[in-house]
């Protein structure tokens, strides 16, 4: 049986891909012409159908300036002289270390709250790591209950520190703690929150591009938060294509596996489908063990080997050669993941997310309106962006198998060990 890898800085802090209309930033694939904190006045147009997950945008023009990083204090505390200063935070313990950053659990000396400090080492010859610039520039404009909050940015000669809200665990570790599949009611609330956050960023012209359980943080009250925006990209970028090395293999859609670099928000929706199945079934949907070929075979075994009739244009993808793949017919998803049949409308929703042809995948907003969520309180669809779903009466997580009702609450924290995490 395949085992999840929940280790790494990714499971502490994670990035996104959204820019509000009034805070668009110039984004380019190389460092040579990127100013993350410069606004652009170019209009970005959204063209999509109500249910189609693939949203395309006009590109904004990009200038030729050198990259700059400027210190920005938390918008929520603009009058406090202590925000934006390194000595405003106390490091408590190291949570993880990667090739260019170290993450610490910390405490704010301003308000006493726990924070996560992502300390990025700056090297004169290389400049600021581009993924860090991208993450900071995107996150500073995002304000949503289901997106990890960037409190502060501290820039010194030696380091760039991103100060995030501290979140106790992630979905990968949560599922490892509760093997065999999660409580169906909890799956529904986690998925609703994931779609809520994705709908927000997609409407803001942003793709996450790296959805996986390690990048979905879960607070001690059960709030799910999108994180790890290092691979996120605003769809106002001038380039029409992106690197296909963007999503962990198990959650990577078949179009990207086949070499497509022309994708949009539909990329994220495949990952949603994989995570949905994994939460219900208790195992990864497509746990490839070898390489891209093996990963595709696992997908086609269940969904059917594509052809021009089921996937227009598939024969023109760089890595598609019909003779390389076993010819499979599509199966009912419950044949592969039997627990989908135990939950009303779960199989139908999963089938509309896990579509090989990208344009057939359900959008985040359309998924929120699926019958799978029909038994949730209507007030959930009326919440403001910054309101938690748990502010609605009678909305709460249920105990997992073997747990008591006191698992979630302010006096409890997850027994998570991140100190051994490695990038």
Swiss-Prot record:
Active site: 210 (proton acceptor)
Family: Belongs to the protein kinase superfamily. CMGC Ser/Thr protein kinase family. CDC2/CDKX subfamily.
Catalytic activity entry: L-seryl-[protein] + ATP = O-phospho-L-seryl-[protein] + ADP + H(+); L-threonyl-[protein] + ATP = O-phospho-L-threonyl-[protein] + ADP + H(+)
Binding site for ATP: 95-103, 118
Name assigned to this protein: Cyclin-dependent kinase 14
Enzyme class at the top of the EC tree: transferase
EC annotation from Swiss-Prot or TrEMBL: 2.7.11.22
């Amino acid at each position: 049986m395949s085992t999840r890898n929940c280790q790494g800085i990714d499971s502490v802090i994670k990035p996104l891909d959204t820019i509000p209309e009034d805070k668009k930033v110039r984004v380019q694939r190389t460092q040579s012409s990127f100013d993350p904190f410069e606004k652009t006045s170019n209009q970005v147009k959204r063209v999509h159908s109500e249910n189609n997950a693939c949203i395309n945008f006009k590109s904004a023009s990009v200038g030729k300036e050198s990259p700059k990083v400027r210190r920005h204090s938390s918008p929520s505390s603009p009058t406090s002289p202590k925000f934006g200063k390194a000595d405003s935070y106390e490091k408590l313990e190291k949570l993880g270390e990667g090739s260019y950053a170290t993450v610490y659990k910390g405490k704010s000396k301003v308000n006493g709250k726990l924070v996560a400090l992502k300390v990025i080492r700056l090297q004169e010859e290389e400049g600021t790591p581009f993924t860090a610039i991208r993450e900071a520039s995107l996150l500073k404009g995002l304000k949503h209950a289901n997106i990890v909050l960037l409190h502060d940015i501290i820039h010194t000669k030696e380091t760039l520190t991103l100060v995030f809200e501290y979140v106790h665990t992630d979905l990968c570790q949560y599922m490892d703690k509760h093997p065999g599949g999660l409580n169906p009611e909890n799956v529904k609330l986690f998925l609703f929150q994931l779609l809520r956050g994705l709908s927000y960023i997609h409407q803001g012209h942003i793709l996450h591009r790296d959805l996986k359980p390690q990048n979905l943080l879960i607070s001690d009250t059960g709030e799910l938060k999108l994180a790890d925006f290092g691979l996120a990209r605003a769809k106002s970028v001038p380039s029409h294509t992106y690197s296909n090395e963007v999503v962990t293999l198990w959650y990577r859609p078949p179009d990207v596996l086949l070499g497509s670099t022309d994708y949009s928000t539909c990329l994220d929706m495949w990952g949603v489908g994989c995570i949905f199945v994994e939460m219900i079934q208790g195992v990864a949907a497509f746990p490839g063990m070898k390489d891209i070929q093996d990963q595709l075979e696992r997908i086609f075994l269940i969904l059917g080997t594509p052809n021009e009739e089921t996937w227009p244009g598939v024969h023109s993808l760089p890595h598609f050669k019909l003779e390389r793949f076993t010819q499979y017919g599509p199966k009912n998803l419950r044949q592969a993941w039997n627990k989908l049949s135990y939950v009303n409308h779960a199989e139908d929703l999963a089938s509309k997310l896990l579509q090989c042809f990208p344009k057939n995948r359900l959008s985040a907003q359309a998924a929120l309106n699926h019958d799978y969520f029909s038994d949730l309180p209507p007030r959930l669809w009326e919440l403001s962006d910054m309101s938690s779903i748990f502010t609605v009466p009678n909305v709460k997580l249920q105990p997992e198998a073997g747990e008591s009702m006191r698992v979630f609450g302010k006096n409890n924290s997850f027994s998570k060990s991140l100190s051994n995490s490695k990038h």
